[in-house]
Amino acid sequence: MAGTVRNVIIIGSGPAGYTAGLYSGRALLEPLMFAGYMSGGQLMLTSDVENFPGYPQGIGGPEMMIELREQAERFGLEVHDKNVERVDLSKRPYSVWVEGEEYRSESLIICTGAESIWLGVEGEEAQKGRGISTCATCDGAFFKDCLLYTSDAADDQL
């Protein structure tokens, strides 16, 4: 792939990545996305998304990511479920390495999102997406008037 220079490479597959793919696809830029091995990111562990426009009754995170991907692919987004190993932003075209192969692009959109920090306590794995929350601002309303335990007093949890 090193000989071909793409117009747009997108790294990350959350709502921002698929929105970038949708718009660049509609602009006929033939976007290429590296979604990672866990396409959809944190929303894949989210049972109810109620704070995203267009879903008045809410939607499950995995279902939302499927819809976003299908819509972006409809407009020409090419998705590879692979992890990016490294990038070189020192010169254009930019270089992106995936599984030892170099891809080059005039534009690079990086939307890798965030990653939750898990405690590693007993039972935690089984409860991901079923009561353990890693986003107080996203999920706080679900736990109104409940007794809660927080492991981090970040500003968004207070």
Question: Where do the protein language model's features map onto the residues?
Answer:
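Hydrophobic/small residue at the entry helix of a nucleotide-binding pocket
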Residues: A16
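Single conserved hydrophobic/aromatic residue that forms the stacking wall/gate
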Residues: Y149-L158
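FAD-binding core/adjacent interface of flavoenzyme oxidoreductases
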Residues: M1-I11, A27, L32, V79-C146
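Conserved catalytic-core motifs of eukaryotic protein kinase domains, centered on the activation segment
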Residues: L43-L45, G120-V121
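Aromatic pocket-lining residues of Rossmann-like dinucleotide-binding sites
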Residues: S24
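Conserved acidic E/D residue at the C-terminus of a beta-strand in Rossmann-like folds
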Residues: M33-A35, D152
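N-terminal Rossmann-like dinucleotide/flavin-binding domain of flavoprotein oxidoreductases
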Residues: M44-E102
